[in-house]
A protein has these predicted regions:
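Low-complexity, polar-biased intrinsically disordered regions enriched in Pro/Ser/Thr/Gly
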Residues: 1-3, 19, 27
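Bacterial N-terminal signal peptides that target proteins for export
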Residues: 2-14
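Bacterial N-terminal signal peptides
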Residues: 12-23
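N-terminal secretory signal peptides
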Residues: 27-93, 150-154
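Mid-chain, structured segments of secreted extracytoplasmic proteins
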Residues: 73-121
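C-terminal partner/receptor-binding element of secreted or periplasmic proteins
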Residues: 109-157
């Protein structure tokens, strides 16, 4: 059996240590300066529930000027999440309803039921959840700072 030379093992250990620091360093720095919380994509993340509805949990995460909003049901199931910055939205591929999130950049077909509720709103973002058949939800995320009626056509009322 052939063994690695001692210097080969030390080099491998140093590379592994540097890789670990590269991954963990930004996350620890974000938590130290108050920019990040843990748990995006988790059922019960380490973040405050900011939902305006008693029927939903909404968690907001901020990192590098980008706001991430996650919507969970009362059982902690992740339904959808998206990133928002300066009126631009990107739906994240997490949650059972991720394919049913409408944004100004990605409008969805009109749902059968349009009677939803606002589950989150701040100075930039508003989120409406609308129940549909078979326990699926449609969600609409819009920019609350939009003033152009044509550009804001997917706006939640």
């Amino acid at each position: 059996m052939r063994h690695l030379p001692t210097h080969g093992f030390k080099a491998l250990a140093a590379i592994a240590l540097l890789a670990g620091m590269a991954v963990c360093g930004p996350a620890m720095a974000a938590n130290q300066n108050g920019q990040g919380q843990n748990g995006l994509g988790q059922s019960w993340p380490n973040a405050q529930d900011v939902s305006s509805s008693p029927r939903w949990h909404v968690y907001v995460f901020n990192r590098n000027g980008i706001r991430y909003v996650q919507i969970n049901d009362l059982n902690g199931n992740v339904r959808a999440a998206f990133a928002a910055q300066s009126g631009n939205f990107l739906v994240l591929p997490i949650g059972t309803d991720a394919s049913r999130v409408a944004t100004p950049q990605d409008p969805q077909p009109a749902p059968a039921n349009t009677q939803g509720e606002i589950v989150y709103q701040d100075s930039d973002v508003k989120v409406q959840v609308t129940p549909q058949a078979n326990n699926v939800m449609t969600m609409q995320a819009v920019d609350t700072t939009c003033n152009d009626p044509v550009e804001c056509s997917s706006r939640v009322n």
